[in-house]
Amino acid sequence: MCGITGYIGKKKTTEVLLNGLYALEYRGYDSAGVAISDGKNLEIIKSVGRVKELETKINKEDKLNSLYGIAHTRWATNGEANLVNAHPHKVGKITLVHNGIIENADTLKEELEQKGYKFNSDTDSEVAAAMLDYKLKDNDILTAIKLTTEILTGSYAFGIMVEGDNSLYALRKDSPLLIGIGDCENFLASDITAIIKYTNKYILLDVGDIAVLTSDTCKIYHDGKPIEKEILISDSKGVDNSKNGYKHHMLKEIMEEPVVLNNLIERYKNKANRSELDLSKYEQIDIVACGSAMYAGLVGQNLFEEYANIKVDVYPASEYRYKKKLYGKNPLVILISQSGETADTIAAMREAHKLGIETLGIVNNPDSTIARECDRKILTNAGVEIAVATTKAYILQVCVLSLMALETAKVKKLVQGDEDYKAFEKLPALLKSVLDNNSYYEKVADSIYQKESCFFIGRGIDYAICMEGSLKLKEVSYLHEAYQAGELKHGTISLVEENMPVLCVITNKALKDKSISNLKETEARGAFGIVITTKDLDDFENYTKIVVPTTSMFTQSMLVVPALQLLSYYVALKRGCDIDKPRNLAKSVTVE
């Protein structure tokens, strides 16, 4: 969600800050701003919209030869997206940027108003700035920060500048923030991608740590005392903002799927590497995730239960921590997150740890909170996704889960032979053949893009596929929704209207007839059907259809979903939607 970066050193401050904000664009935002200082004077420049608009304003308005500064991309949570609510916020001597949610902001605001503070914005962040300014009146800055954090409830990462003090301050609780270490320069950032252009050395802040940065020093304090922190080295390659000739990042990232899939599958051609995939010792698995990652989990659930005989439940992370836990023997909690910083998923992981339950993270970001804190992890190595709607990262999450289900089934001697592993080896080439047919998906999109709603229906694993296909269409073109085919007649069918497209996913021969029966029910009420199926099941002469190659059930979904990703892309393109940055969405959801 919100992105923070800061810099103090000898380079041009605004250039470093803007580069950081551009690298953080993938997180999602609706406004941006910087605060910069030359040691005596402070400038705050904000804009609503893209970082490019902020850069234009900076080029026009910046008059300082600044030495340090902080910057922010905001995704509105408290207060609408406008210039007043954009960060940074200045109250008295304090200027700050904030990622997170201050849950007791309304109460604190009333207290501060009684003390004479007036507020310009609707944000909880301005309340935090005011409280820090109030505490600074009778205390030094480190004490003031400590006292303020004792009052605040909720989550936060702060970058702070103090009038008359030529240092940067940083602290965090639950929201991510790290310190970058350079040569006569230092940085702060929400994640390493914002600063990797300048340094790969960084320090992770723990809750209660306060970082004080000058160009030459980085001091960390905890409970008022200086402490030493390990300097880590990141192997991140940063954000590749190029589109390689494609019109949108989403299309580029879809087309990269065969390559990243091949890289992952190559890792497990060596049988010695497959031991980390074996979950045969567990009798119960909870998969916890949000959004697309949760729908990847639904695919995994179907495969584990069908082929490995392990009971699997899939939960939205936002609900899991509040659920009564009924663990059986040998449980495992699998956490899936592209960013590794999804707030609800992190909270669920920590809840599992409190209960002594083993956790396994499937993550893309090796420097993330989940990657660091889970008991063990598998990295998907999809590379950074710029488009907000995930594509290649989702496919690799499904691939990891599918490989786990297969290896576990083989260890338990429930699946014999090597045919299914061979299906994985053939998968990248088959997927390329699906994606090479992208002009056909554009043609199918012609029958959808002018509609106001759209149903996806399926049974079993096909329903899991429908959920992700529907989410993609919702995210980028604002059309919906997915339903279990057998549940249509229990209420949902009342929503069917004349000429409504209903997409029916059929990859399981045993469920084919029932799914078609449900599709015909919608057609009898005026809908028109579109069938997404496999070559061996294709006898749908009278339907608009998308047909993908037939493969193992362990790999079949990874041919169907990319076809639906392309279909969603072309529907959004024809509707004139902002494909890479859909309205109201953030890539990395770092608040609960």
What are these regions (language model features)?
Residues 280-426, 459, 505-549, 567:
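Glycine-rich phosphate-binding loops that contact phosphosugars or nucleotide phosphates
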